[in-house]
Amino acid sequence: MPSLYLASGSPRRRELLTQIGVSFTVLNAQIDETPFDHETPAAYVERLALGKAQAGLSVLAAEQQACVMGADTAVVLDGRILGKPADEADALAMLTALSGREHEVMTAVALSDRHRSETRIVTSRVRFRPIQPHEAQAYWASGEPADKAGGYAIQGLAAIFVEGLQGSYSGVVGLPLCETAELLGHFGIPCWQCLEGDES
């Protein structure tokens, strides 16, 4: 079985892979995440996911059986990518823009080995209830929005803003598990390898 590496510093992605019983090693693979001019959000997340996987593979030059996973998530409102907020004003502007509206969350996952690469893109729709200014300020003060795409974490304190979701909850968090499991299977990596309570 190939050795799986996760080219991501995201604790959410580590937790999600662990949740489905996959054994992996975290790998640091830095790439330039600047969007290209006129690049669509779907093309952007796919390029970054694939770029992370391939950058990770190049770090593991000596390991022939390596398989590297990369992923990237973008919050998209009116066709515009909302990245990680630069500061408090940026975060509050994002939350104000998302307030009372539906937006898209796109996550791409890529797997690469020495012979091939495959990607999947999953788009989900999230609707926020209206967010009051004092709520947005209190949420920023919690520290949670600072390193999150779109300035919020659906699995965290921002759960109280979510009126509805169509699509993949795990995809919104950062790794669509149904599609990820399918990709892993294509590369000969099973889920449920290491389950809690397994005595073997």
Swiss-Prot record:
Nucleoside triphosphate pyrophosphatase that hydrolyzes dTTP and UTP. May have a dual role in cell division arrest and in preventing the incorporation of modified nucleotides into cellular nucleic acids. CDD domains: Maf (cd00555). Belongs to the Maf family. YhdE subfamily. Its cofactor is a divalent metal cation. One of its GO terms (cellular component) is cytoplasm. InterPro entries: ITPase-like_fam (IPR029001), Maf-like (IPR003697). Disulfide bonds: none annotated. The active site is at residue 72. GO terms for biological process: nucleotide metabolic process. GO terms for molecular function: dTTP diphosphatase activity; UTP diphosphatase activity. It is found in: Cytoplasm. Its main location: cytoplasm. Keywords: Cytoplasm, Hydrolase, Nucleotide metabolism. It holds the Pfam family Maf. Its EC number is 3.6.1.9. It catalyses: dTTP + H2O = dTMP + diphosphate + H(+); UTP + H2O = UMP + diphosphate + H(+). The keyword Cytoplasm applies. It comes from Pseudomonas savastanoi pv. phaseolicola (strain 1448A / Race 6). This is dTTP/UTP pyrophosphatase. It is an enzyme of class 3 (hydrolase). The record marks 12, 73, 155 as: Important for substrate specificity. SUPFAM superfamilies: ITPase-like.
